[in-house]
């Protein structure tokens, strides 16, 4: 299996499976001299960690990260710092229940990667989905923490869930602080209460539901990205679509721009102090593939979890028609834990863009 690496200068390779002994990543291209230790990375892994509420999988994993290489400390450094060599990070799996999956080892879960993997490789790890499991995203979150060090403290990355099932937040109620007060990363306190009732019913019914995640990057300077085939928004879209269960991406106004007039969609400008003052951000912070200095805004549609308790029609590897239900511990809405993953992918793309911009322009 190839294509386990993304990025150009800031390159991340993830490895490992859902029910293997461990998973992790190798990061190449990180500049030397950046402060980096395990507790810094751990804070982001804890945001994604399973078993934190009844609305996510009850698999109990500490997700404790271990730094295996690329970081050094002695009496001449101010704490652990990156050396510029590959950074290897590892997270052990400790709560696998592979026996839960024996019933489906020869049966395909509709909507999952089972059938496609079998057709391509002729073999698949049915235990939790192997590489196709959302468990792989723990490594991405770890890499995203390193990317944040590359970006520095002037760039703020934040994410939220803005829709679960048919229930969408009211943008007028948006409060970033509220995302820390509920298990959904919801910026609308009123909608968070509705989601709790809705997801309880979904969970008890044995089904699952989808979500929309929105991530923002503030403080990105104008000029990152490149025209045509190196567009920053194209890099962002590709990174977000690589997330497990992602089925759609919007940047800025996204598909709503199709119903706007030219005047409505224009991000009109007025003179500011050191930079233009934009009157709108329908471009989502990117124009012509290059950052404008506005907030970068990306939304990701996350499909319902494919592994559900309710029976669905499928076939076996031999073509026999069967009904499939998945016994195990699964997220009723995997979109909730996709928030720190989307933040991490945003961080990695921007870190790569920063290094590429510096290499091309010298600043």
Swiss-Prot record:
It is an enzyme of class 4 (lyase). It comes from the Bacteria. One of its GO terms (cellular component) is cytosol. GO terms for biological process: amino acid biosynthetic process; aromatic amino acid family biosynthetic process; chorismate biosynthetic process. PROSITE patterns: CHORISMATE_SYNTHASE_1 (PS00787), CHORISMATE_SYNTHASE_2 (PS00788), CHORISMATE_SYNTHASE_3 (PS00789). Its EC number is 4.2.3.5. NADP(+) binds at residues 48, 54. Reduced FMN (FMNH(2)). Pathway: Metabolic intermediate biosynthesis; chorismate biosynthesis; chorismate from D-erythrose 4-phosphate and phosphoenolpyruvate: step 7/7. It catalyses: 5-O-(1-carboxyvinyl)-3-phosphoshikimate = chorismate + phosphate. PANTHER family: CHORISMATE SYNTHASE. Homotetramer. This reaction introduces a second double bond into the aromatic ring system. This is Chorismate synthase. It comes from Hyphomonas neptunium (strain ATCC 15444).
């Amino acid at each position: 299996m190839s294509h386990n690496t993304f990025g150009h200068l800031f390159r991340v390779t993830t490895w490992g499976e859902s029910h293997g002994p461990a998973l992790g990543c190798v990061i190449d291209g990180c500049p030397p001299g950046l402060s980096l230790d395990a507790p810094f990375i751990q804070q982001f892994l804890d945001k994604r960690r399973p078993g934190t509420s009844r609305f996510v999988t009850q698999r109990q994993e500490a997700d404790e990260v271990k730094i295996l290489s690329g970081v050094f400390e002695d009496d001449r450094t101010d704490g652990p710092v990156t050396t510029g060599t590959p950074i290897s990070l590892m997270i052990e799996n400790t709560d696998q229940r592979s026996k839960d999956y024996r019933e489906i080892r020869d049966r395909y879960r509709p909507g999952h990667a089972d059938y496609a993997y079998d057709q391509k490789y002729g073999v698949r790890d049915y235990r939790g989905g192997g590489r196709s499991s959302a468990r792989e995203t723990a490594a991405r979150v770890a890499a995203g923490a390193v990317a944040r060090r590359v970006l520095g403290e002037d760039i703020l990355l934040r994410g939220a869930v803005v829709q679960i099932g048919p229930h969408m937040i009211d943008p007028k109620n948006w409060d970033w602080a509220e995302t820390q007060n509920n298990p959904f990363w919801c910026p609308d306190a009123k909608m968070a209460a509705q989601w709790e009732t809705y997801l309880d019913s979904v969970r008890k019914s044995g089904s699952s539901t989808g979500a929309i995640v929105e991530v923002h990057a503030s403080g990105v300077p104008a000029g990152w990205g490149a025209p045509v085939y190196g567009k920053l928004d194209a890099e962002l879209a590709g990174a977000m679509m690589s997330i497990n269960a992602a089925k759609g991406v919007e940047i800025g106004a996204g598909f709503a721009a199709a119903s706007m007039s030219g005047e409505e969609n224009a991000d009109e400008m007025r003179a500011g102090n050191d930079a233009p003052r934009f009157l709108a951000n329908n471009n989502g912070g990117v124009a012509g593939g290059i950052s404008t200095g506005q907030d970068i805004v990306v939304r990701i549609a996350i499909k319902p979890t494919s592994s559900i308790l309710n029976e669905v029609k499928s076939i076996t590897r031999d073509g026999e028609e069967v009904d499939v239900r998945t016994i195990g511990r699964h997220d009723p809405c995997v979109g909730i834990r996709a928030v720190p993953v989307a933040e991490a992918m945003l961080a990695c793309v921007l870190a790569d863009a920063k290094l590429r911009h510096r290499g091309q322009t010298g600043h």
